[in-house]
Each structure stands twice: as C-alpha cells, then as structure tokens.
Amino acid sequence: MALRTLASKKVLSFPFGGAGRPLAAAASARGVTTVTLPDLSYDFGALEPAISGEIMRLHHQKHHATYVANYNKALEQLETAVSKGDASAVVQLQAAIKFNGGGHVNHSIFWKNLKPISEGGGEPPHGKLGWAIDEDFGSFEALVKKMNAEGAALQGSGWVWLALDKEAKKVSVETTANQDPLVTKGASLVPLLGIDVWEHAYYLQYKNVRPDYLNNIWKVMNWKYAGEVYENVLA
C-alpha cells in the first residue's frame, strides 16, 4: 500500500498492537511519525456512475483529511504526555489515536481498492485469489452476496472486509465498527478489500439505501490490487 508518510520525527511503533502494547509503546517512545493524506491514482469523477465525483471529493478531501489531522494532533499530544510522564493523559489519548489512526489506515486501503471501469475496475478476480474465493465461498457471486449482506446488516457505521488469514491461509468476510482497522479482529488478518459503509461514503448519492451502494461499488472494485496483496502475503 503506497501511503505518503511524512516521517518528521522518530517512529512511534503503535497504535494497533495487542492488549497492553499501545501504552508500553508510548512509555518508551522518543518521538512520533505523522502521516499525510495519500494522493488518489484517479480523478474524483473517474468512478462515476458507481460513486459520484462529489462524494469522492468530500470523502477524500474532508473526511480522510480530518482523520489525518486529528491523528497527527493526538500523536503530538501523546509525545508531550509521555515526556511529562502523564500516564492519565496517555490513557485518555488512546481512543483518539485508535479512531483517527484507524480512519487513516482504512481509507488509505479503500482508495487502493477502487479503480475506474476504463482501467479494469470491476473485473472479477483471477489467479490464486480467484481460486481461493471459489474454495472458501463456493463462487465469486457467493462472496459478493455475503459481503453485501454483511455490509447492509452492519448497524451504525463501520466497514466490511474481505480478509486473508495469513496463518490459516483462508479468506473470510469480516466487519469492524466505526474506524476500527481489521487488525483489531485478529493479528493474522490482512485486508484485501474494504468497503466503507459509513453514510458519508454513499448518502449524497444513494440516500439511506445502503444496499444500492453496495451493489454498485463492485463495478469499480480493483481486484488486481487485492490479488497482488494476497499473493505477496503468501509468497
């Protein structure tokens, strides 16, 4: 995943580790790494009619940009709290770091998961990932049906994922609430595809009919990228 990460200070190696790890990492931190908003590889309107240019512009320039800004702010505050030995402030900042950091991680994957139809978006998966989907779900159509059902049924805001368990070497459908990244469901899970089911991802175009958004997003899904991630992880 090509993220434009600005390493303005020393690296802080969290926040999405296992139980107890975020605080331990914070306690030993000597600096932070801020992040920047990644560029899109296509124009805002390139995914129409599946996703409108207006939605893409707002989603990228406003929503994702806000997660980036708030994550960086929280990391700066964390650095100050650690330097002062303020354990209470460190604990309080964990929620903001997880939410905004998760928002940045999830959206950075999401943009890579999309591709204009003219550039191959929507073409079904081939090769090893295609075979894995057939083996674990029965067919590509069955996978789409399951992800649509899981995404439509997700209460509130969140994400529906096609995940690879790199230990079991199986693909599965997972959901996460709010901006929780997939790794919070299991350290061995790697995101292949993520679909944002927050209302900001579809409401301006599809209103409250989330299933229509889910049905149409497959027309611009970048299965080539998902297949490359799958093969690289299992190489």
Curated annotation (Swiss-Prot):
Annotated Pfam families: Sod_Fe_C (PF02777), Sod_Fe_N (PF00081)
Cofactor(s) recorded in Swiss-Prot or TrEMBL: Mn(2+)
Enzyme Commission number: 1.15.1.1
An example molecular function term from Gene Ontology annotations: manganese ion binding
Domain of life of the native organism: Eukaryota
Family assignment from sequence similarity: Belongs to the iron/manganese superoxide dismutase family.
Name assigned to this protein: Superoxide dismutase [Mn] 3.1, mitochondrial
Biological source species: Zea mays (Maize)
